[in-house]
Amino acid sequence: MADRHNRDLDRKPAPLPEALPVPCVDSHAHLEIVTNTDAESPEVGAVLEEAASVGINRVIQVGYSAEQSEWSVRCAEKWNTKVLAAVA
């Protein structure tokens, strides 16, 4: 996707935090920015698995434009037990 919020794409990800004591939901995510891939890509699944490893078992994927909202819906369709789509 072309729109990446002017982020530094070369920066290294932060280390993972300790796992949460109970399962939680990430209430506002932009997986399209993190992965820069198609919604159905295995890279999205890898990010979801990484989140699960620290206690985030569900993600609300927020679309902020028509294109990102469509991406969010495709993502929720593909990863339906782990992702819900929302529109901001």
What are the residue ranges of the model-derived segments?
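Mid-domain alpha/beta scaffold segments of enzyme catalytic cores
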Residues: 1-88
